Amino acid sequence: DSWRHWEMHPRGDEVVLCTEGAITLLQEHEEGIVRTHLSAGEYAINEPGVWHTADIANSATAIFITSGEGTEGRPR
């Protein structure tokens, strides 16, 4: 299922590695929403302070590596 919230990590980058299926990562920047499609084996970086969420059409598995300290969330 697609995420029901946005999140932001202020203290470090987050590596998002798709290991199975596919996801679309949405990142909120000043110029608008940037969508990045990830298939198995592909990764993206969420920079510190960037609000992000994800859409998942079917099913997917991903690994998230980040500094969780100070993480904020908000409804989508």
Question: What does each model-identified segment do?
Answer:
Residues D1-P10:
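Conserved short histidine dyad/triad with adjacent acidic residue
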Residues R11-H29:
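Glycine- and acidic-residue-biased ligand/ion/polar-headgroup-sensing regions
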Residues T24, G32, T71:
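Flexible, glycine-rich phosphate/dinucleotide-binding loops
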Residues T19-E20, S39, N58:
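A cytosolic small-molecule/anion-sensing beta-strand core signal
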Residues W3-R4, E42-T53, T71:
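Histidine-centered metal-chelating micro-motifs
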Residues T53-R76:
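Double-stranded beta-helix
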Residues R11, V50, N58:
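A generic "binding-loop/recognition-motif" signal
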Residues H29-P48:
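Short acidic-glycine-tyrosine-enriched beta hairpin
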